[in-house]
Amino acid sequence: MLFRSGRVLQRQIDPDQLKQDMLAGCHYLNSSPDTTGRLGVTGFCWGGGMSNQLAVELGSDCHAAVPFYGAQVPAEQVPSIQAPLLIHYASNDPRINAGWPDYEQALNANGKEFEAHFYDGTNHGFHNNSTPRYDESAAALAWARTINFFKANLYS
């Protein structure tokens, strides 16, 4: 069978090794003379959760993080976040949104800079134009906010 779904392949990957690979890539980019040294991360769904985790793991080496409907990190990890966060959520995403109240409380309690948006009438994956969940107007708005956020935080 030549085709396997992303979820099947995802289950075959060691999550700790994948996180280490992502961290290595971020460290490489931060040290490369071909970059500004100001790193921003973004991701969607699983990648949104990884964006939150990278903000924790990278500390001051991450300068902006934009998770799209990603799992939140545990409250005890929030103090390690140094980057400002722009967080995008679908309004109809009970599994992911269930973690938001505790995450928001931890971000506030630790004085973290963040902005969160819930897009009315959208479902998890609203930015993916290859699925029926795609919401063009919400995706366009979220993407414009993302680009503006990166411009504000990654350019001197």
Where are the language model's segments positioned?
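A conserved short beta-strand
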Residues: 61-71
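Short, small-residue-biased leader/transition segments that mark boundaries at the very start
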Residues: 1-2
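Alpha/beta-hydrolase active-site loop
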Residues: 6-33, 144
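Alpha/beta-hydrolase fold nucleophile elbow
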Residues: 33-44
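Acidic catalytic loop of the alpha/beta-hydrolase fold
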Residues: 92-97, 124
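Short beta-strand/loop motif that positions the catalytic acidic residue
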Residues: 81, 86-89
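C-terminal catalytic histidine-bearing segment of alpha/beta-hydrolase fold enzymes
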Residues: 104, 108-156
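Gly/Ala-rich beta-loop-alpha elbow adjacent to hydrolase catalytic centers
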Residues: 43-47, 51
